[in-house]
């Protein structure tokens, strides 16, 4: 952990969650310090996306507690959790195709009048949008829509960012740009990040720690700068 990291920003204790007929997360406990980035890795169907949706309140908790910056959000609806300072970029594209790029970026702002100031801050990280704000988001490529989700999350200036496979299907140059944006966000604002990622080099670059999920449980974890971290991660993904 760096010196910028502080008290626990995201704390899950004994969280059990799932869908109507199935339990996916099984008494999962984990903590993320303020300013820290943790990468969640594992094969598909192991509970990673369920974990983020549970944190955001999209799935009911059957047991356990979730705290955001010390506040119990276990029973709060998604919009209240967002107001508590949590921004979520889901795996599926959540872009409003018929709205302009500008209007998509404004959606997460409590005060729409803050757009110009926020975009002046975030826009240079995503130059593809700077001259296209009036265009419909539906004109963007799949990769550009992913970047729009990330830019929208950064515009909110949250204390916690949740990202679900934001690099999936992207070109290496775009992945590098996203890594730079996340590192910038963490350095400038001390933002806490919890991200699901299958692109291991990206995870190792932007995260301080990693956790491997299997069948809704954390089966391994470590620091990304540990010798052998990459091999440990790949060994779980290969099995």
Regions found by a protein language model. Give the residues of each.
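Helix-to-loop junction immediately C-terminal to a conserved catalytic motif
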Residues: 56
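Conserved ABC transporter NBD signature motif
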Residues: 64-71, 84, 117-118, 124, ...
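ABC ATPase C-loop
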Residues: 153-154
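ABC ATPase NBD coupling module
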Residues: 60, 72-92, 131-134, 226-233
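Helical segment within the ABC ATPase nucleotide-binding domain
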Residues: 176-189
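Conserved ABC ATPase signature
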Residues: 136-140, 144
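The feature captures the beta-strand-to-loop junction immediately N-terminal to the Walker
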Residues: 41-43
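Walker B catalytic motif
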Residues: 165-166
């Amino acid at each position: 952990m760096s010196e910028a990291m502080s008290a626990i920003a995201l704390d899950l204790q004994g969280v059990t969650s799932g869908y109507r007929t199935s339990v996916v997360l099984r008494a999962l406990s984990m903590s993320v310090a303020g300013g820290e980035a943790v990468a969640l890795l594992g094969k598909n169907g192991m509970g990673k996306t369920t974990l983020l949706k549970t944190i955001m309140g999209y799935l009911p908790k059957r047991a356990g507690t979730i705290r955001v910056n010390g506040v119990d959000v276990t029973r709060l609806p998604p919009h209240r959790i967002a107001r508590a300072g949590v921004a979520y970029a889901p795996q599926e594209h959540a872009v409003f195709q018929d709205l302009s790029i500008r209007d998509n970026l404004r959606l997460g702002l409590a005060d729409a009048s803050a757009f110009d100031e926020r975009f002046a801050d975030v826009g240079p990280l995503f130059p593809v949008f700077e001259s296209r704000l009036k265009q419909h988001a539906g004109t963007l490529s799949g990769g550009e829509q992913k970047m729009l989700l990330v830019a929208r999350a950064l515009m909110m200036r949250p204390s916690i960012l949740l990202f679900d496979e934001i690099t999936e299907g992207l070109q290496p140059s775009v992945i590098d740009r996203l890594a730079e944006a996340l590192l910038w966000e963490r350095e400038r604002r001390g933002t806490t990040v919890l991200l699901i990622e299958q692109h291991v080099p990206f995870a190792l670059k932007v995260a301080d720690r990693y956790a491997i999920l299997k069948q809704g449980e954390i089966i391994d974890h470590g620091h990304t700068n540990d010798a052998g971290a990459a091999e440990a991660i790949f060994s779980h993904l290969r099995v």
